[in-house]
Amino acid sequence: MGNKSTDKTEKTEKTEAFTVKKLAEWISIKKIAVAVGFAFFASMVPNWLLAFIARPSGDDYGYSAASHQTWLHTHSVIEVLRTGLETTKQMCQVWNGDWFSVFIFTLMPEAFVYRSFWIVPVFWTLAMIAATYYMVHEVFTNYFGLKWYEGGVVTLLILLMFYQWIPSSGIGMYWYVGVIHYMMPHVLAMLLIGFLLKYLRTDKFRYIIFSVLGMIAIGGSSYYSAFLVLFSYVLMFVIVKNKKRAGVFAFPTFAGMIALYFQVTAPGNAARVGGEQMGFSVGKAAFTIVEALWQGAVNVVNYWRETPLLFVLLFFVAVVAWECLSEAKLKFEFKYPVLWVGYMFGVYAAMYAPELYAATEVSGGPGTMEYLTFILTTVSSVIYVEGWILRKLELRHTLKRREIYHKCITVPAVFVCLVLCLVFRGNLKDSLFYSSCSYIASGQAADFKEQMESQERILRDDSIKEAYLCPTNPEQGPLMHMPVIKNPEAFTNRVVGNFYGKDMVTTTE
């Protein structure tokens, strides 16, 4: 009896061990990458569907009104570009200094082709995906020698965190001016960091030329992305041992600083925030630095309190990255983890500086860029610290086999994260996916589409010079729309009228 019982126990243990081993083998990093990819792209589907409902709004019409009228009367791209330059010059004198962004503002797709606004959210989300992957791929595949899908899973997790809890979906996708002012420079920044790494690896000067062009565009667009790239250049200059080789970074750095100088000193900036407030002072700069560091720390706590699921995904990034890095060719030394983490926090905190220094009310753009930079710098810090630990373990010959780690850590972490998703399911309701699905399912998206079509039938009728529009309901879901109101002198009313060539635009109520 005793032997039979022992045999049965051993058989059960072997079966359980076999099952766990098979499960661990089945849940590979590649399958995790596929699952995360499916989750990310599935979460973006309702947002891309709403792209075909989204319409231009407010400033979208204002900046491109003259370009649209020029196109209608001439159908000449050259004339439209000339008009765009005139609008840019005017706006830099009276309102804002981001000259490159303003020029792109004037070229809104809708200025050329009716119902082409869907291009904005679809193209720029795809551009964000491609640029983020390009940068991560350069590090994970070309520097660490990992497989493409190992960098892919990190990329997808970064994008999933960003888009699902984005502070402003309008800035991220549905407001043309917001997308061009914030997302376009960030896409360029990701590419430029990739170009920088590419140059260091290949010594091909064309990547410096690309970087010069990119920095000119960023310097004329966004302080946030300019800071991000400039901080990256400084970091790489310090890290690279061959200073003569690293000195080539001076070309894109100076190009960006010159472009940024023209943006900062444009008269429109002073007009926008009250003249003397744009003046430089050492005291104000010191206050801005201290306050930016404080605000950065406070908002990290706020992210933790308001979106704990974000930190669950960051934990999963750490788990997956460790397994991938355990087989990486870690030629980089990872000597100073504390300094790296501190520097990354400084880069993140720097995103608060422009709004603090200007001391003026801002749109949802700064909060969106601060959040995105927090994700990027946190992931960077996690990977650096893990690289440092792995280098230490390698030197001491105590590094565990990847198979053991995968079975004992990665696979359980998958299930732990799934359980935590249930625990923090309230955050799922805060996600952009849930918001978009609710907006579509409730019928509000269809109502918005019908209301926009009703207004546009009147606005596109050239025989009508005084347009009386039915008012829209305030339910916009994740979309971004500044409605026409009763007052014909209101900003939105005037710019819509200018875009469509109307003498007056108002509502029937």
Where are these regions (language model features)?
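Intrinsically disordered, polar/acidic, low-complexity terminal segments
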Residues: 3-6, 16-96, 109-152, 243-245, ...
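Transmembrane catalytic cores of multi-pass membrane glycosyltransferases
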Residues: 46-111, 116-118, 176, 223-366
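Hydrophobic alpha-helical transmembrane segments of multi-pass membrane proteins
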Residues: 119, 123-127, 160-161, 180, ...
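Transmembrane alpha-helical segments
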Residues: 128-140, 188-200, 230-238, 316-321, ...
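Membrane-interface micro-motifs in multi-pass membrane enzymes
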Residues: 147-197, 350-383
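Short hydrophobic alpha-helices at membrane interfaces in multi-pass membrane enzymes
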Residues: 198-217, 247-250
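Transmembrane helices and adjacent periplasmic/lumenal helix-loop junctions
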Residues: 209-236, 422
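Transmembrane helical hairpin unit
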Residues: 321-431
